[in-house]
């Protein structure tokens, strides 16, 4: 099955991410999508929207440990709170 993915890099704020996902959800509700569709928003926007069943969320980055004193990093334990199962490499 093909995968369609969008990596936001640092191009969206929480508000613009929410608006983008809202429009994407509307499109997916009215169109048959057989592909797996993923978005990779900024880490500050991981909880700023709701996904429909055809859309999956991933993280742009993660540090290779569950947690610890790693300034500025995102640990796997933190991503688990958002039910993140996919990370860009």
Regions of interest found by a model, annotated:
Residues 1-74, 81-82:
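Conserved N-terminal beta1-alpha1 strand-loop-helix module at the mouth
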Residues 85:
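Short acidic/polar active-site loop segments enriched in Thr and Asp
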Residues 89:
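Short beta-strand and adjacent tight-turn residues that come in two discontinuous sequence segments
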